[in-house]
Amino acid sequence: MATIKDIAQEAGFSISTVSRVLNNDESLSVPDETREKIYEAAEKLNYRKKTVRPLVKHIAFLYWLTDKEELEDVYFKTMRLEVEKLAKAFNVDMTTYKIADGIESIPEHTEGFIAVGTFSDEELAFLRNLTENGVFIDSTPDPDHFDSVRPDLAQMTRKTVNILTEKGHKSIGFIGGTYKNPNTNQDEMDIREQTFRSYMREKAMLDERYIFCHRGFSVENGYRLMSAAIDTLGDQLPTAFMIAADPIAVGCLQALNEKGIAIPNRVSIVSINNISFAKYVSPPLTTFHIDIHELCKNAVQLLLEQVQDKRRTVKTLYVGAELIVRKSMN
């Protein structure tokens, strides 16, 4: 990209003069011809003035996952790194707090927050008393008070079912994880499983025997659940599975490969996330690409709307995803 120095050389004026003209310094007295030459040089060199963003202070990033949960699912680690990178790009002075720190560790002078993870009712009440400005990524735990940005998992689930049925699959299973409700400590059904059940029921295709779910979204969980499906169903194994997330899908592929079950000729697999190694597993994974950069960028922008522009209307933003077709589905 062209610099002030480049424009000064092109136009034949000093760097100081060029800088003051391009920054509309009203105290500078130069002929109109000089200004015109500088503007022409800037246009010729495709110069774009850098936007100086005001510093936004006292922002908290609540990363409410354990180290084990992050290790099991690279999706969240990628999200954390992206939020921290974008905070710098948008000139946001942000401090990261982890679940081990506890909600009480967040200081009273906090102006706003971005949050990832699962929060209890008590923690949400604490945040409501702390600030009006907050954005959750990947969940909507308090839509009456705080913004959220999340991938449209329900739509991805319906699209998966539609694609598989269009390809002639009549028996479709689901393998996924569950979440622990922080208020009850009980396992709860994920939105992907909820949508799969309701949509398959609408199509009169739901078969409870084909659904295998257990807490966690790890490779190990996927391996264990697909192994259980193979052992339980035998020759009645469905011809396709929707998998809730790529780490689970990797474990499922391992189990199928170990048993010599052909993918995709015998069982097709479709997953969600498109994590970095999805294209390197055997066979390469057909999966929805969730744009984590876009999720996080929208979260930062929504927070700045609240903090800087004083917006009070609560927003919930769903982000779509592109299906990346590889060799695990036919």
Curated annotation (Swiss-Prot):
GO BP, sorted A to Z: regulation of DNA-templated transcription
Record keyword DNA-binding present: yes
Keyword Transcription regulation: yes
UniProt keyword terms in alphabetical order: DNA-binding, Repressor, Transcription, Transcription regulation
Lineage top rank: taxon: Bacteria
Domain spans labelled HTH lacI-type: 2-57
Pfam families with a match to the protein in the record: LacI, Peripla_BP_3
InterPro entries: HTH_LacI (IPR000843), LacI/GalR-like_sensor (IPR046335), Lambda_DNA-bd_dom_sf (IPR010982), Peripla_BP_I (IPR028082)
DNA-binding interval(s): 4-23
MF annotations from Gene Ontology: DNA-binding transcription factor activity; transcription cis-regulatory region binding
Job description of the protein: Negatively regulates the expression of the ganSPQAB operon. Inhibits transcription of the operon by binding to an operator in the promoter region. In the presence of galactobiose, GanR dissociates from the promoter, resulting in the expression of the gan operon.
Name of the featured protein: HTH-type transcriptional regulator GanR
Organism (species): Bacillus subtilis (strain 168)
Gene name for this UniProt entry: ganR
